[in-house]
Design a protein with these regions (language model features):
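A short helix->loop->beta-strand "cap" motif at the edges of active sites that frequently abuts
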Residues: 27-32, 136, 183-186
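Conserved S/T- and glycine-rich ATP-binding loop of Class I adenylate-forming
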Residues: 11, 71, 77-80, 113, ...
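Conserved AMP-binding A3 loop
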Residues: 72-96
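Adenylate-forming
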Residues: 13-23, 39, 117, 144, ...
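Conserved pre-ATP/AMP-binding loop-to-beta segment of ANL
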Residues: 51-76, 83, 106-112
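Structural core segment of the AMP-binding/adenylate-forming
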Residues: 1-52
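Short hydrophobic/charged patches on amphipathic alpha-helices used for structural packing
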Residues: 63, 75, 147-150, 177
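Conserved AMP-binding/adenylation subdomain of ANL enzymes
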Residues: 95-112, 120-160, 170, 174-175
């Protein structure tokens, strides 16, 4: 629905997500850019690998005139009450969001941020922009797995963990069983829904 509603003609897709069951969907797009990784199949016919896509580009950066009120991104709502709706966001929106968040939680160049949030939602995309703006390192999670999140905190000495309250409840229950080192964390950021007081404590 979203692809048709937004009139998308170019798809940037991780190779691992290409399966026989969804090959027909991917082949609907005029242009396909494939990010090579583990897994995946070769059903797409025409397409270009991401590295090749970058090599084909010109070395000089194109001239870009900033206009903070022109829409840059269309993010779709979750569609819990009706069909998802495309929300047009511009540079001013993203700037205000990142400024407001960084006033409370500074993301610095030495920080390592666990990114287990979906990047196609506003919460995840804003957190990613804040981290990049502050020069922090993003530790991307391919899928939601509580054990994987706790394991990555210890493995990469993560300092910032942004999640939704529901996910925190899973992690707290798992953490109570022992065996996970989260001592490197400086901030746990909660968003997308109200955080219950009991969970906070």
């Amino acid at each position: 629905f979203i692809a048709e509603d937004a009139g998308i003609d170019t798809l940037l897709v991780d190779f691992a997500f290409i399966k026989p069951a969804n090959a027909a969907f991917f082949n609907r797009f005029k242009h396909k850019i494939l990010v090579r990784g583990e897994g995946g199949i070769e059903p797409l016919g025409e397409g270009v690998a991401f590295d090749e896509f970058l090599q084909r580009g010109k070395n000089n950066s194109p001239t870009h005139t900033r206009n903070p009120i022109i829409p840059d991104v269309i993010l779709y709502t979750s569609g819990t009450t009706a069909r998802p709706k495309g929300v047009m966001l511009n540079e001013s929106h993203f700037w205000a969001n990142t400024e407001g968040a960084m006033a409370h939680v500074p993301f610095l160049k030495d920080d390592r941020v666990i990114m287990a949030l979906p990047l196609f939602h506003s919460y995840g995309s804003i957190i990613a922009l804040i981290a990049l703006r502050g020069g922090a390192t993003l530790i991307l999670s391919r899928q939601f797995a509580p054990k994987g999140i706790l394991g990555n905190i210890a493995k990469y000495k993560a300092t910032i963990l942004p999640l939704a309250p529901t996910i925190y409840s899973f992690l707290v229950d798992l953490y109570k069983r022992g065996g996970y080192d989260v001592s490197s964390l400086k901030y746990c950021v909660s968003g997308s829904a109200a955080l219950p007081v009991a969970l906070l404590h």
